[in-house]
Design a protein with these regions (language model features):
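Short, solvent-exposed coil/turn elements at secondary-structure transition points
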Residues: 9-11, 40, 112, 117, ...
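An N-terminal RHG(E/S)-centered segment typical of histidine phosphatases
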Residues: 16, 24, 28-29, 115-156
Length: 156
């Protein structure tokens, strides 16, 4: 199947920080702000963390609406991106302010699952790299949360 490339899901434009080591960046005056108040960060010669989140969340919601329109509610689809993009999308789906997104861990090649419904997004998994995801073939149905959290997903 066709896999489009969406530039709105590319990593943050770190500008002059691009390609530098984390240990080197940690010596910059901006580093503590990146860690504690990312919503206030504009990378020198790059973009702001807030604009990165706005474009990536808009792209995910746009793709989700298009897949639902074409394949129906509960359609399962995949987006592949980078850590800060994924963390910012998860923060939005969890209703977290961008300043809290550093609390979310996203490992390389991990899977996070968000389902957008009419009333709100629901987060089904974050940062997982274990287990069989075949239960997704049944689709994910979001609506009101079950009382007591429900009994989890039913295996196919």
């Amino acid at each position: 199947p066709y896999a489009p490339v969406d530039l709105d899901l590319t990593e943050c434009d770190y500008g002059q920080w691009q390609g530098r080591t984390l240990s080197d960046l940690a010596t910059e005056d901006l580093w503590p702000v990146v860690q504690s108040q990312p919503s206030a960060v504009v990378f020198p010669g790059g973009e702001s963390m807030a604009s990165m989140q706005a474009r990536s969340v808009a792209a995910i919601r746009r793709h989700d609406a298009a897949f639902e329109a074409e394949y129906g509610p509960g359609a399962v689809w995949v987006a592949v991106s980078h850590g800060d993009i994924i963390k910012s999308i998860l923060a939005d789906a969890l209703g977290m302010h961008l300043d809290l997104f550093q609390r979310i861990n996203v490992g390389p090649a991990s899977v996070s699952i968000v389902r957008y419904a009419a009333s709100r997004p629901s987060v089904y998994a974050t940062n997982t790299d274990a287990g069989d995801l075949s239960w997704l073939s049944n689709g994910i149905h979001s609506g009101d949360a079950p009382v007591g959290g429900g009994a989890g997903q039913k295996a196919p």
